[in-house]
Design a protein with these regions (language model features):
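Intrinsically disordered, low-complexity Pro/Gly/Ser/Thr-rich segments with frequent PxxP/GP/PP motifs
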Residues: 131-168
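Extended substrate-binding grooves/exosites of carbohydrate-active enzymes
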Residues: 1-117, 121-129, 134-142
């Protein structure tokens, strides 16, 4: 909403950059797709900075557990704002990083009237150079057909419509 309002005002001619968006604390980042779609609507939207990459939770003395807040014999507090990253302090992936990765995938596919529309979000690379698609069609948990999509020659920042060929 904030981004849409900014670009609705014709006087705003400068690019828009989100500062500390997607606060990655706990089970967060569920609105990443909403931010992505908003940025897609406006050419002047140039991204943002996720807060933040990793937790800052050191190991407790003589323990394999990481601590924060009052865990270090300091005054009890609600200081868990050091545990707000996409990865833990020892760089283990958190679920919100998987959400982020999925939203910012380099190729998106949409079904359209018996075709698949592919959009290549890569800036400099043809999709065929970076991506291969292997698919399986299943019925009652058994694979009935599988194959490879080889004609992914989609220029950077372009869209292609490919026929969807399903078995009879």
């Amino acid at each position: 909403e904030e981004l849409d309002a900014y670009f609705a005002d014709a006087q705003n001619q400068k690019p828009y950059l989100f500062c500390e968006y997607l606060h990655a604390m706990g089970n967060s980042c569920g609105d990443t797709e909403d931010y992505f779609q908003a940025m897609e609507r406006h050419a002047g939207a140039c991204g943002g900075f996720v807060w933040e990459w990793c937790n800052h939770s050191p190991y407790l003395p003589n323990s394999s557990k990481m601590g924060y807040g009052g865990d270090f014999n300091d005054t009890l507090n609600d200081g868990n704002f050091c545990a707000d990253g996409l990865v833990t302090a020892d760089r283990q992936i958190q679920s919100n990083l998987l959400e982020y990765k999925n939203v910012y995938r380099p190729l998106r596919a949409t079904l359209k009237n018996g075709h698949v529309e592919f959009k290549n979000y890569l800036d400099f690379t043809d999709a065929a150079e970076a991506i291969s698609i292997h698919y399986q069609i299943t019925e009652d948990f058994s694979v009935v057909k599988e194959g490879q999509i080889d004609d992914l020659n989609i220029a950077p920042k372009s869209t292609a419509l490919l026929p969807l060929r399903l078995p009879a």
